């Protein structure tokens, strides 16, 4: 996976002063719960022989990646950056032992490509009970 981003100059960025105020003076937490009708996604997944879970992960990832505001982070030297894209982290639950694996699959704009990557990652880490994949800074 190629990790590519653009470095942000806080002094030149139009939102730089506001960003500094929030980061320096406020505790920032975001949580969101909404009801969403997934009927069309279920039908699409069935018609295209896709599993629902990776389809759901993909569609949320697609929306997140259309908003630059969700792609800001810090690089390893502490610079503010904006990722070109971010990849989802998700949990794969193991019924047999009630454990889980936390996985990351590289995002693709194409649902079919993402679904293939998802299944490869799932199979590759089937026996793992850990956090697997990319470092936490380029994912959500």
Language-model-detected regions and their locations in the chain:
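Flexible, P/S/T/G-rich "lid" or insertion loops adjacent to the active sites of thioester-utilizing
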Residues: 1-46
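Histidine-dependent nucleotide/RNA phosphoesterase domain, centered on the 2H-phosphoesterase fold
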Residues: 59, 71, 130-133
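Acyl activation and transfer enzymes in specialized metabolism, enriched
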Residues: 41-66
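Small-residue-rich loop/turn and linker elements
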Residues: 70-104
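Residues at beta-strand starts and edge strands
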Residues: 28-30, 50, 54, 86
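Helical lid/core segments from catalytic subdomains that handle acyl or acyl-like groups
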Residues: 94-140
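A generic secondary-structure boundary signal that marks alpha-helix termini
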Residues: 65-69, 127
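A broad, low-specificity signal marking well-ordered, structured residues that form hydrophobic/aromatic
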Residues: 32, 88-90, 139
């Amino acid at each position: 996976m190629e990790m590519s981003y653009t470095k942000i100059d806080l002094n030149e960025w139009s939102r730089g002063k506001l960003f500094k105020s929030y980061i320096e003076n406020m505790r920032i937490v975001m949580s969101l719960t909404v009801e969403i009708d997934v009927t069309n996604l279920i039908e699409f997944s069935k018609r295209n022989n896709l599993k629902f879970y990776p389809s759901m992960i993909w569609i949320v990832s697609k929306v997140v990646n259309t908003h630059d505001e969700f792609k800001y982070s810090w690089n390893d030297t502490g610079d503010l950056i904006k990722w070109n894209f971010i990849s989802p982290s998700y949990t794969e639950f193991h019924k047999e032992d009630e454990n889980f694996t936390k996985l990351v699959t590289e995002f693709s704009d194409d649902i079919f490509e993402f679904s293939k990557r998802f299944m490869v990652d799932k199979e590759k880490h089937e026996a793992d009970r850990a956090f697997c994949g990319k470092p936490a800074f380029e994912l959500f």
